[in-house]
């Protein structure tokens, strides 16, 4: 009687072992996708967790840096792409890649539900929009008055010599916020007048940072009196108790849109399409709304406390495709004139 029981136990154990071995390849088949992004560092963890919970067969490997660095990297890798997906990069950069035939056409599932302005006009689509962010002025209401520096209301005000060495803004070659600001000035003022304005502004700049968030943080701390920076960072600093006013310049607010796209040549197309699908889901837009006041899903109004009212009405009229196409020319001129005051990298 003992032998049959033993034989049954051995067979059962063997079956379990075989099942375990069969399960290993299934786990090993998880696809790893390389995602290039300029998202804020505190965003990528929640985005990865939400995507992988919905898609357990795909794992995201982030490559994160500032907009300028990621844009330059994608362009440098044009003939040998390393990224599978771009998720969270300025749409002006993504539009540039599109014009160079670097994106894989794909209309994500559910893309018809998002706002028309947040969709590529191509069919199939080449990219989809996530959210929009604006450039604002963050003015320290405690320290600046001590130095007899009045609260500005316009971009033109920043050329006033009273602000000498008191202003900080992002380097447009590094920061998307910086580039959208310089580009918008050219649209608002005209090219000649804009460069003349920037010559005067340069005299008042203490440093050009490599981050769109840093200027409002520095203004919030009283290290600089005025920061030209990312709208949501200003709102967060003010909500945390910083003595700053967040100002939309009366000439209009520079802006760009974050976008998602699949890189042409990806070896993981099916997995990349899952990222693109997730990026236009309602759940994804709820995540975007935790960091941005303007998102691409209808009916969502995620503006946080202390965010400037009617900000979307202040957005400067721009052509994202032209903004991308003019990038190299504008940055070359800006670097030649002003890069000497850039912070060390």
List each language-model region with its residue ranges.
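A ligand-binding cleft/hinge motif common to bilobed small-molecule-binding domains
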Residues: 92-96, 220, 224-243
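Short beta-strand->loop
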Residues: 103-112, 127-128, 156, 242-254, ...
């Amino acid at each position: 009687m003992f032998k049959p029981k033993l034989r049954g136990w051995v067979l059962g154990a063997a079956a379990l072992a075989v099942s375990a071995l069969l399960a290993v390849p299934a786990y090993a088949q998880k696809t790893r996708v390389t995602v290039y992004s300029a998202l804020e560092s505190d965003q990528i963890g929640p985005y990865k967790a939400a995507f992988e919970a919905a898609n357990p067969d795909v794992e995201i490997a982030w490559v994160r840096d500032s907009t300028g660095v990621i844009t330059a990297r994608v362009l440098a890798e044009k003939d040998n792409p390393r990224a599978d997906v771009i998720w969270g990069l300025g749409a002006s950069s993504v539009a540039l890649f599109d014009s160079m035939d670097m994106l894989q056409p794909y209309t994500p599932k559910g893309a018809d539900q998002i706002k028309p302005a947040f969709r590529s006009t191509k069919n199939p689509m080449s990219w989809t929009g996530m959210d929009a962010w604006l450039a604002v002025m963050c003015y320290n209401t405690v320290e600046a008055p001590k130095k007899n520096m009045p609260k500005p209301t316009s971009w033109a005000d920043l050329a006033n010599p009273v602000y000498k060495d008191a202003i900080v803004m992002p380097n447009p070659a590094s920061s998307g916020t910086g580039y959208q600001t310089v580009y918008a000035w050219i649209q608002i003022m005209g090219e000649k007048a804009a460069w003349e304005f920037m010559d005067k502004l340069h005299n008042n700049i203490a440093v050009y940072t490599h981050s769109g968030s840093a200027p409002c943080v520095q203004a919030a701390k009283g290290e600089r009196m005025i920061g030209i920076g990312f709208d949501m960072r200003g709102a967060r600093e003010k909500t945390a108790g910083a003595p700053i006013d967040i100002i939309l310049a009366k000439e209009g607010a520079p802006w760009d849109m974050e976008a998602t796209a699949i890189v042409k040549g990806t070896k993981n197309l099916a997995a990349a399409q899952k990222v693109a699908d997730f990026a236009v889901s309602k759940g994804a837009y709820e995540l975007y709304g935790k960091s941005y006041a303007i998102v691409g899903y209808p009916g969502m109004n995620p503006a946080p406390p202390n965010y400037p009212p009617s900000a979307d009405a202040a957005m400067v009229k721009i052509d994202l495709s032209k903004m991308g196409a003019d990038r190299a020319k504008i940055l070359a001129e800006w670097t030649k004139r002003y890069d000497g005051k850039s912070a060390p990298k």
